[in-house]
Structure formats: structure tokens, C-alpha cells
């Protein structure tokens, strides 16, 4: 298999120029292009002030991007927030696709705090994802994914927590709140699979300066699976309190809310330990730890729900979902 080309500014300019010529608007130097991320392979580019160009750099990403175009059309009528619209798509290199999307106005959840009204927007998002017919999503190629074992995740988090304690990053006794029986009670319930965005991180939530959630980006990782995964993602993006309030407003009961909370908590412990192991003494490494530390703090916010919940067999787990 040949090596995929690395996108460059010249690559992007040539592609944008060709698109402008097709649209009959060529002329002049064309819009400014610049990579969105400062590091890594520059696969996402700003094109002027109004568009975003995303370039697939491997076959798997190509398949996911092609599926995303159809999935966004399926999701759009069900959710109260904006979903990106593609104005052009095709191949930028043999077998590798591009999508040129309209930029959604606003910042991210890493730049703006989500307000109470924004939490209602998130509730509408979770509710809308639950309403997307699973069979229609499957026909688009959205995969079904089995729920993760919370007990296995808990054990892995416990195993690395002492390393974080020695680095003065985390108090391992906090994990004692989740016991093996507690993890078993928070197992995903049969028949609860819904469409899950699966990457509701702060950078994928478009938030306006007034705290409203205006849109959701990057649907390439969407699956049919455990709704607690999106609650966990929101806990990392906006904090456990806001995530649980949004999920409760969307109709989810205590069990999926607490499951999402503990998925997020264990994930952040594991991620911070991984990032600490990989660091050196340089200033960039210190900066790279800022976001994992912030997400850990958000996930470990104390919430009232976990203090007042006692599970029984007849507990209501959430909406009556059909997968």
C-alpha cells in the first residue's frame, strides 16, 4: 500500500482554487487557508472565515467521512442544535476524500461556559439522539458497539491511581466511592442502545458567548451503543453537574447518569496517568497536561445525585428505549 500524501497549504490552495473554478467564482488570490491544529498531521483547515476543509488521510477515515455526510442528514431533523452542512465533497487524492463544510458561528465549550439555557440545549441533543431510528442509522453503516465494563475500567483506574498520588495529581481514595458491587449495579441495561455521538468533547461543542450550545461537530465516531458514553463525554466537556442535569432533563434516570459519571471519572484517571508517563521535562509537556487535569477536575465534581441514590431492582433507569 502506498503512503498517503501529507496535506500541505499548497495542496489545500490548489483544491480550493479548483472548487472556486467549478463554482464560477475564481479570481484573485483566493481565501486564506490555515491549519486548525498547530501539531500533528494538518488534516483540518480553515478556508477563509466561513468554511472548514477536512481531508481524510487514510482509508478508514475516508469511510467514516463518507458515512458522516449521510448521518448528519439523518440526525439534523431530530436535534435542536446545528449540525455542519457540507457545501462540497469529493477526492483530494486517489481514494481519499475531502469535505468542505460551512463553519458554525461561535467558540467551543473549552472557550465559553455553558449556561443553564445551554444545558437545556444539551438535553435536547441527548433527547434527539435517542429519537434517531437505530435501523436507519445501521443502514448508513453506523456500527453497534457493546457497552464497556465499568468494573474492568474501575480496576484499571485503581491500578494507576497510586502513581498519580505519588505525582501529587490525585487522591486514590476517591475511587473507593465506586465499589465492585456499585459498578455491577451501574452496568448498562439490555435494550438501551441509542445513537451515540461518542466524542462530545469540549472542542466539538459550538458554544456562543451567552452560553448557548449552538452546534455539534465531528460525527465520524458515532455508534449505536451505550447512552452513558455521551453523558460521560459531557462530564469532561462541561462538568459532571451540568452533564447530569442535562441528561436528567432529557429523561434519563439515575442509573445511566451515574454510569456516565463514573465512566468519565475512570477515563480521566487513566488518561492523566498515560500523559504523565509520556511527558518529559519540557514546557510543551507541562502545557499538554493542562487539559487532562482540567477534565479530571470536571469529571470529579461532586453532585447531589450520587449522595441520594439507592438502587433497587425496580428503579427507573431512564426512557423506554427500543434498539
PLM regions and their residue ranges:
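An alpha-helical support segment within catalytic cores of ATP-dependent transferases
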Residues: 7-28, 91-92, 105, 115, ...
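Short helix-capping segments at alpha-helix termini
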Residues: 24-26, 77-80, 168, 241
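ATP-binding pocket architecture of kinase catalytic cores
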Residues: 30-149
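Helix-rich C-terminal or lid/interface subdomains of diverse kinases
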Residues: 41, 109, 232-323
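Conserved catalytic motifs of the protein kinase core domain
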Residues: 48, 96, 191-193, 212
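Active-site Asp-x-Gly
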Residues: 60-62, 193-196, 201-257, 261
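Conserved strand-to-helix beginnings and helix N-cap segments that scaffold or border functional pockets
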Residues: 65-66, 228, 286
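Short strand-connecting beta-turns/loops that link adjacent beta-strands
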Residues: 91-95, 210-212, 265
Amino acid at each position: 500500500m502506498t503512503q498517503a500524501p501529507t496535506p500541505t497549504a499548497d495542496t489545500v490552495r490548489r483544491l480550493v482554487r479548483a472548487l472556486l473554478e467549478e463554482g464560477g467564482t475564481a479570481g484573485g488570490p483566493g481565501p486564506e487557508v490555515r491549519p486548525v491544529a498547530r501539531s500533528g498531521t494538518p488534516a483540518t483547515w480553515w478556508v477563509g472565515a466561513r468554511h472548514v476543509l477536512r481531508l481524510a488521510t487514510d482509508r478508514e477515515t475516508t469511510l467514516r467521512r463518507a458515512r458522516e455526510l449521510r448521518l448528519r442528514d439523518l440526525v439534523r431533523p431530530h436535534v435542536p442544535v446545528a449540525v455542519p452542512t457540507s457545501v462540497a465533497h469529493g477526492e483530494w487524492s486517489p481514494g481519499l476524500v475531502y469535505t468542505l463544510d460551512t463553519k458554525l458561528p461561535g467558540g467551543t465549550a473549552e472557550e465559553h461556559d455553558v449556561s443553564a439555557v445551554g444545558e437545556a440545549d444539551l438535553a435536547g441533543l441527548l433527547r434527539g439522539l435517542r429519537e434517531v431510528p437505530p435501523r436507519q442509522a445501521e443502514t448508513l453503516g453506523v456500527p453497534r458497539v457493546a457497552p464497556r465494563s465499568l468494573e474492568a475500567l474501575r480496576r484499571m483506574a485503581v491500578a494507576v491511581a497510586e502513581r498519580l498520588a505519588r505525582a501529587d495529581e490525585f487522591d486514590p481514595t476517591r475511587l473507593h466511592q465506586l465499589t465492585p458491587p456499585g459498578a455491577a449495579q451501574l452496568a448498562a441495561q439490555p435494550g438501551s442502545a441509542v445513537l451515540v455521538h461518542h466524542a462530545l468533547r469540549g472542542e466539538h461543542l459550538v458554544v456562543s458567548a451567552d452560553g448557548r450550545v449552538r452546534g455539534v461537530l465531528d460525527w465520524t465516531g458515532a455508534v449505536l451503543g451505550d447512552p452513558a458514553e455521551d453523558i460521560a463525554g459531557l462530564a469532561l466537556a462541561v462538568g459532571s453537574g451540568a452533564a447530569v442535569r442535562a441528561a436528567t432533563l432529557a429523561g434519563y434516570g439515575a442509573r445511566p447518569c451515574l454510569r456516565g459519571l463514573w465512566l468519565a471519572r475512570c477515563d480521566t484517571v487513566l488518561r492523566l496517568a498515560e500523559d504523565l508517563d509520556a511527558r518529559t521535562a519540557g514546557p510543551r509537556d507541562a502545557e499538554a497536561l493542562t487539559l487532562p487535569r482540567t477534565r479530571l477536575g470536571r469529571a470529579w465534581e461532586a453532585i447531589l445525585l450520587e449522595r441520594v441514590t439507592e438502587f433497587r431492582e425496580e428503579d427507573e433507569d431512564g426512557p423506554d428505549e427500543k434498539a
